């Protein structure tokens, strides 16, 4: 199963992206992973808002009980990596640490048009 949505790259679209994930997974019968998937999309979508360019595409695919979620934007930033823990007082900088803990696998890359792709993969129990 596949689903795709497109959003302007603005903070007010984050709630629509979360609702899309929630509704899509519920319709696919994947209720056990909705909370994790919504949090993962929140982190990736927020990174696209802060560091990307152009519209944001949200793609979801469920194959053999494995959910892949991808957030794509027109930003041409360098590949991302985990940085050090920002510390207890920091108000930012934890997004990829959260992604790393919740996702079984995750990564990023650029397509032939230079668009940035961030993806996560989780199993649906």
Regions found by a protein language model. Name each.
Residues 43-44, 48:
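Short, small-hydrophobic-rich alpha-helical interface motif
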Residues 5-7, 29-31, 81:
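A short, structure-level motif marking secondary-structure boundaries and short turns
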Residues 1-4, 49-125:
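Conserved beta-strand-loop-beta-strand hairpin that lines the nucleotide-binding pocket
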Residues 3-18:
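STAS-typified acidic loop motif
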Residues 15-42, 90:
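Conserved short strand/loop->alpha-helix "switch" segment adjacent to the catalytic nucleotide/phosphoryl-transfer site
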